[in-house]
Amino acid sequence: RKFIIANARVENCAVIYCNDGFCELCGYSRAEVMQRPCTCDFLHGPRTQRRAAAQIAQALLGAEERKVEIAFYRKDGSCFLCLVDVVPVKNEDGAVIMFILNFEVVMEKDMVGSPARDTNHRGPPTSWLTPGRAKTFRLKLPALLALTTRESSSVRPGGTGGSGAPGAVVVDVDLTPAAPSSESLALDEVSALDNHVAGPAEERRALVAPGSPPSSVPGPPHTSPRAHSLNPDASGSSCSLARTRSRESCASVRRASSADDIEAMRAGALPPPPRHASTGAMHPLRSGLLNSTSDSDLVRYRTISKIPQITLNFVDLKGDPFLASPTSDREIIAPKIKERTHNVTEKVTQVLSLGADVLPEYKLQAPRIHRWTILHYSPFKAVWDWLILLLVIYTAVFTPYSAAFLLKEPEEDAQTADCGYACQPLAVVDLIVDIMFIVDILINFRTTYVNANEEVVSHPGRIAVHYFKGWFLIDMVAAIPFDLLIFGSGSEELIGLLKTARLLRLVRVARKLDRYSEYGAAVLFLLMCTFALIAHWLACIWYAIGNMEQPDMNSRIGWLHNLGDQIGKPYNSSGLGGPSIKDKYVTALYFTFSSLTSVGFGNVSPNTNSEKIFSICVMLIGSLMYASIFGNVSAIIQRLYSGTARYHTQMLRVREFIRFHQIPNPLRQRLEEYFQHAWSYTNGIDMNAVLKGFPECLQADICLHLNRSLLQHCKPFRGATKGCLRALAMKFKTTHAPPGDTLVHAGDLLTALYFISRGSIEILRGDVVVAILGKNDIFGEPLNLYARPGKSNGDVRALTYCDLHKIHRDDLLEVLDMYPEFSDHFWSSLEITFNLRDTNMIPGSPGSTELEGGFNRQRRRKLSFRRRTDKDPEQPGEVPALGPARVGAGPSSWGRPGTPWGDSPSSGPSSPESSEDEGQGRSSSPLRLVPFSSPRPPGEPRGAETLTEDGDKSDTCNPLSGAFSGVSNIFSFWGDSRGRQYQELPRCPAPAPSLLNIPLSSPGRRPRGDVESRLDALQRQLNRLETRLSADMATVLQLLQRQMTLVPPAYSAVTTPGPGPASTSPLLPISPIPTLTLDSLSQVSQFVAFEELPPGAPELPQDGPTRRLSLPGQLGALTSQPLHRHGSDPGSAVWDWLILLLVIYTAVFTPYSAAFLLKEPEEDAQTADCGYACQPLAVVDLIVDIMFIVDILINFRTTYVNANEEVVSHPGRIAVHYFKGWFLIDMVAAIPFDLLIFGSGSEELIGLLKTARLLRLVRVARKLDRYSEYGAAVLFLLMCTFALIAHWLACIWY
């Protein structure tokens, strides 16, 4: 479909939308068609029938539907016959609000032999046009209703005309017969065809109001700044919509782009640009509808019963052949990917590969591999790894099962004796598995790997060495076929134990499956599989224990005997019979699962000591597995609901913000709706923060990918270099807008250029829709034509969900300054679909001095050293800001108002030589504080400005600029003005000082050579100072290290600072720095590179109180004390571990001996016979008591560190500190109660007193707290604590 939409309420029924099919049909861009009359007189030519044109105009005037065949001309001059279908769209009250004109090509006319061509069509024929591209346009009915109500509320009441707002001009179409007025306008074309077209004069009224200045319909718009004139023959169009008989009053057409208005200013050759016409007279019948401005009327007009459904679609039904980017343009997106030829199987390999060293895509390389060498990321290796994984899983399941259940079964033995090894299916499968494992070893010897430098190693020798140092031993042990080696020897138990060596391969599999730990579902599945596998192993062990005790047990109390009695299959006296293998395995698996998940149900219970001990171990393992699985499940669920929790938290903040500031309900609803939509679109993630976490080179590639559609399909960006596109992509910002969101308000500064990527927007002036824009449209203002940002002449509102790319004017101009060869192409190709700049709000903007001289040539702006905070001067007519003067070039400082800034002597681009001369001339002139609005006299110098030479266009700061803030007190021999010059460098870490502090007598900008020489001097002074400080510090620290070698710890040579003043060690001052002081030296010491100090030197603290080094006398006094033991000595560490083992022994055997051994008859008889020495535990307890007493003596001579982190070695202070601390606990735990109360007969009292040794566990727990940061150590300590508490409770239970 090819159609246009015109607003019936706007002057001349201007076009507010045209789809891509119409643009392709006529050859004009959307920017050239917007705001033109819907009669399409710009398509008329010599063969256009005047009668057909008059019929279209009559249909528009009469607001009636009509189909007309008419000959139109394309932009290249070719003619075609078209069927135009005029469809008026009415609101619920029957008033026409818009027209839809549909165009269907009937046939093409051959215009080769035609001598006459329309003057409107002078462009050369283009070869990329494809006639008849079918594209549709879809706009929902609520948008049309909203358009109706907005337009209805913008018309003045009454029937008299008047001057309306410039952006909201409406046209009155008289629908009833009336007497012709002398002020009425007639159509020349209709009057010329009176014999053919009959109709009253009131049906031929114009769509414009009288009194408009005479003007001709302009030709096709030219947005290029290099165009110098409009088409002088454009006024000779064959069909004009409205023209007065005196040719003195002709309505103008307001176009989307204002380039024609600007070009009409030049040289006085053309009349002044047209303005909006006055509002025409209102008909009494329509005033009731148009006067509806209240909310109730607007709601009443939103009914849809009387309006037909009209669908408009922005989506193309088939691709544009001329929009397809060439090969050079398509290479901008991910250029590195095209250099590789990976097929689909390799992509699948990267997903399925189990190798831990698979390279990421951007590091893949094509190494030179030897023959029969396999790449570790090849498809074959991926498939082989999965096959080995399946074999390992088979081994983990069937190896314990066969070792426990099958080796000693009578039927299995009889079958093996009859037909040999081949009769066992599992044995054959095991043999195949062993062969596969051996083949895997051979493959691993020829498989590449990635070394520490991320290089693919393919040399066979290096691969073999790497494999020998890694997994070779485990793989070799797991691949030994023990069944064949020991087959027939009769030692089935040995075979079963040796076959379990295959389980070692599970370690390697666990390492490879660790990559899936980031997926919640995968972790849960692996945990459940691990739980089931451990239960299977424990079931095999449980059966092995019962089977081992079954032949030697006469009491028949084992779990197998109980199982046989329960199911009616008891064992006979010879040990035969009993339950089947299936019954045994299922019962064992049931017991292990019930013990792992709970305490069991009692129907299968342990009876023998071996079974009970194993049950204890099962319950201990079960508690750990139960906690780990449910802990991970809780974490997975929490992770799943983390987004919901964040949403509710952020929503609560929004509501608290609304409540605190008492925001009214309409604005509150907008806030909540926007928050909900933004959250659904981004899930609460700051995409910009995520992007900034990557390096700049990767950011550029990502931005290039995000903006690939815009850069490929937008005409101005075609032909740009990759570097230019990367720079532009970094500057673009993506904006998402929901329906009804206002992107730009009327009167806002136009600081950016917008490119629509998806969706549709409407532009309103007041409540009148003046344009509807869609995909690939551009709106904003032509930045190259204006030195200052203008103000918007309307509101920009989203009709659907929209994605827009915007770039700020400063960013765009900065990139174009860096790529001047692309700048000319960009400005000449840029076609802004709708120009939002309001020229009426800026007096004299189109014909002002800002454009008059600057339009004749391309503007050159030097923005490389311009700060983002340096704004342009205020616009004329506004109150000037009485703030700091702007430093740099601006429109207000280039000349007087009324003088073209381009004609200023300093306006043109200057060479580096002229820049230097100019800088030298300015260096002696004073800097003046000039307000923004005050003009500068022509002869007055511009003062201190930022560097704008062509050679200084880099966007980076000077390497020394970061240090200026730290050494500003030292290098004060430069003037303040020079320091401020370098504070003007962009994006420097040092904040720019306020310009109000600049003295009026400050010198201007220094020449560039002088600046560079002073920078070199500053660099030399910094290097000299750093070298001297490093040498002095190294010397001092070497002297101190000679004394610190006597004391092991690093903090032993550090004492607290005294109350005296800081050290004032003399330092040689540097001659060019007269202001070098100790305070400034302390500042310099903050950035001295301590990495250059000698190795082993202690690191001096820079925060907090300064510590002074201990004196040699203190060190000597420290070493003069005899028999001191320091806490960091190796002997002290060994002694502490020995005491720890003794404490653990005490914690285990003291409750056991107190509960089980003291009142046993055999123990009492043995003690009565040979005395105390006959009890082994008693002897060990005596040795433990002696060791604890020795530990008390050692603690009296062990140094400690006080609260000031000083090493205390005085014996008296050590004794006082020990008496206040652990002495009482250590003394009670070291008392030998066995010897003191031996022979008294009070065994219960001895047992209770011996438990006092457990007090040492408190001290041990304090020392073991340092291992709390290691997860495995904490888990091991928790398990040991659990077992120890169970042991104590068992002793108490006894």
Swiss-Prot record:
<keyword id="KW-0472">Membrane</keyword>
<dbReference type="GO" id="GO:0000976">
    <property type="term" value="F:transcription cis-regulatory region binding"/>
</dbReference>
<dbReference type="GO" id="GO:1990573">
    <property type="term" value="P:potassium ion import across plasma membrane"/>
</dbReference>
<dbReference type="InterPro" id="IPR003967">
    <property type="entry name" value="K_chnl_volt-dep_ERG"/>
</dbReference>
<dbReference type="InterPro" id="IPR005821">
    <property type="entry name" value="Ion_trans_dom"/>
</dbReference>
<feature type="transmembrane region" description="Helical; Name=Segment S3">
    <location>
        <begin position="470"/>
        <end position="490"/>
    </location>
</feature>
<dbReference type="Pfam" id="PF00520">
    <property type="entry name" value="Ion_trans"/>
</dbReference>
<feature type="intramembrane region" description="Pore-forming; Name=Segment H5">
    <location>
        <begin position="586"/>
        <end position="606"/>
    </location>
</feature>
<feature type="short sequence motif" description="Selectivity filter">
    <location>
        <begin position="598"/>
        <end position="603"/>
    </location>
</feature>
<dbReference type="InterPro" id="IPR018490">
    <property type="entry name" value="cNMP-bd_dom_sf"/>
</dbReference>
<keyword id="KW-0812">Transmembrane</keyword>
<keyword id="KW-0630">Potassium</keyword>
<dbReference type="GO" id="GO:0097623">
    <property type="term" value="P:potassium ion export across plasma membrane"/>
</dbReference>
<dbReference type="GO" id="GO:0086010">
    <property type="term" value="P:membrane depolarization during action potential"/>
</dbReference>
<dbReference type="GO" id="GO:0048471">
    <property type="term" value="C:perinuclear region of cytoplasm"/>
</dbReference>
<feature type="compositionally biased region" description="Basic residues">
    <location>
        <begin position="857"/>
        <end position="866"/>
    </location>
</feature>
<dbReference type="GO" id="GO:0005249">
    <property type="term" value="F:voltage-gated potassium channel activity"/>
</dbReference>
<feature type="modified residue" description="Phosphoserine">
    <location>
        <position position="257"/>
    </location>
</feature>
<dbReference type="GO" id="GO:0055075">
    <property type="term" value="P:potassium ion homeostasis"/>
</dbReference>
<feature type="topological domain" description="Cytoplasmic">
    <location>
        <begin position="516"/>
        <end position="521"/>
    </location>
</feature>
<feature type="region of interest" description="cNMP-binding domain">
    <location>
        <begin position="716"/>
        <end position="816"/>
    </location>
</feature>
<feature type="modified residue" description="Phosphoserine">
    <location>
        <position position="212"/>
    </location>
</feature>
<feature type="topological domain" description="Extracellular">
    <location>
        <begin position="607"/>
        <end position="612"/>
    </location>
</feature>
<dbReference type="GO" id="GO:0031625">
    <property type="term" value="F:ubiquitin protein ligase binding"/>
</dbReference>
<keyword id="KW-0407">Ion channel</keyword>
<feature type="domain" description="PAC">
    <location>
        <begin position="66"/>
        <end position="118"/>
    </location>
</feature>
<dbReference type="GO" id="GO:0060307">
    <property type="term" value="P:regulation of ventricular cardiac muscle cell membrane repolarization"/>
</dbReference>
<feature type="topological domain" description="Cytoplasmic">
    <location>
        <begin position="446"/>
        <end position="469"/>
    </location>
</feature>
<dbReference type="GO" id="GO:0005251">
    <property type="term" value="F:delayed rectifier potassium channel activity"/>
</dbReference>
<feature type="transmembrane region" description="Helical; Name=Segment S1">
    <location>
        <begin position="378"/>
        <end position="398"/>
    </location>
</feature>
<dbReference type="GO" id="GO:0042803">
    <property type="term" value="F:protein homodimerization activity"/>
</dbReference>
<keyword id="KW-0406">Ion transport</keyword>
<keyword id="KW-0813">Transport</keyword>
<comment type="subunit">
    <text>The potassium channel is probably composed of a homo- or heterotetrameric complex of pore-forming alpha subunits that can associate with modulating beta subunits. Interacts with DNAJB12 and DNAJB14; chaperones DNAJB12 and DNAJB14 promote tetramerization. Heteromultimer with KCNH6/ERG2 and KCNH7/ERG3. Interacts with ALG10B. Forms a stable complex with KCNE1 or KCNE2, and that this heteromultimerization regulates Inward rectifier potassium channel activity. Interacts with CANX. The core-glycosylated, but not the fully glycosylated form interacts with RNF207.</text>
</comment>
<feature type="modified residue" description="Phosphoserine">
    <location>
        <position position="258"/>
    </location>
</feature>
<dbReference type="GO" id="GO:0097110">
    <property type="term" value="F:scaffold protein binding"/>
</dbReference>
<feature type="compositionally biased region" description="Low complexity">
    <location>
        <begin position="902"/>
        <end position="913"/>
    </location>
</feature>
<feature type="transmembrane region" description="Helical; Name=Segment S2">
    <location>
        <begin position="425"/>
        <end position="445"/>
    </location>
</feature>
<dbReference type="GO" id="GO:1903765">
    <property type="term" value="P:negative regulation of potassium ion export across plasma membrane"/>
</dbReference>
<dbReference type="GO" id="GO:1902282">
    <property type="term" value="F:voltage-gated potassium channel activity involved in ventricular cardiac muscle cell action potential repolarization"/>
</dbReference>
<keyword id="KW-1003">Cell membrane</keyword>
<comment type="function">
    <text>Pore-forming (alpha) subunit of voltage-gated inwardly rectifying potassium channel. Characterized by unusual gating kinetics by producing relatively small outward currents during membrane depolarization and large inward currents during subsequent repolarization which reflect a rapid inactivation during depolarization and quick recovery from inactivation but slow deactivation (closing) during repolarization. Channel properties are modulated by cAMP and subunit assembly.</text>
</comment>
